[in-house]
Amino acid sequence: MHSLPLFHRIAGAHVVVVGEGEMAAAKARLVERAGGIPCPETEAHYARLAFVALEDGHAAQTAALRLKRMGLLVNVADRPELCDFTLPSVLDRDPVLVAVSTGGASAGLAKHLRLRLEA
């Protein structure tokens, strides 16, 4: 095991979302569903977590390094090698929450397993 599985409470907390388009919007929706407050990088001093959702690999890496230097834990969409944490595929049947993760190795496999659990 190379990661510590945990559920992090973010209700009321600012979470940086860097990017534009659907990928960034999906991260912002995820933060909101968990009760967090998506914010721009200019408000990073209020945050502990950040999501980077940029298509350009160099821009994503630059943003991730900048946020890490500010002390934030960073997730970079589709670039697990740049991530401090990865996101599992989630089955939410409140109050039960099941998470399936491959540590970023195969999002497709994690989704497949989650769908089997939903059945």
What are these regions (language model features)?
Residues 1-45, 49:
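Hydrophobic, well-ordered beta-alpha structural blocks that scaffold small-molecule cofactor pockets
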Residues 3, 7, 45-46, 74, ...:
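Glycine-rich phosphate/adenylate-binding loop
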Residues 16, 47-57, 96-104:
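Short beta-strand and adjoining strand-loop segment in the mid-core
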Residues 22, 78-82, 103-104:
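Short, ordered loop/turn segments at secondary-structure junctions
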Residues 24-26, 59-60, 106-110:
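Short glycine/serine/threonine-rich phosphate/pyrophosphate-binding segments
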Residues 49-54, 60-87:
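ADP-ribose/adenylate-binding Rossmann-like module
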Residues 92-119:
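Adenosine-phosphate binding glycine-rich loop
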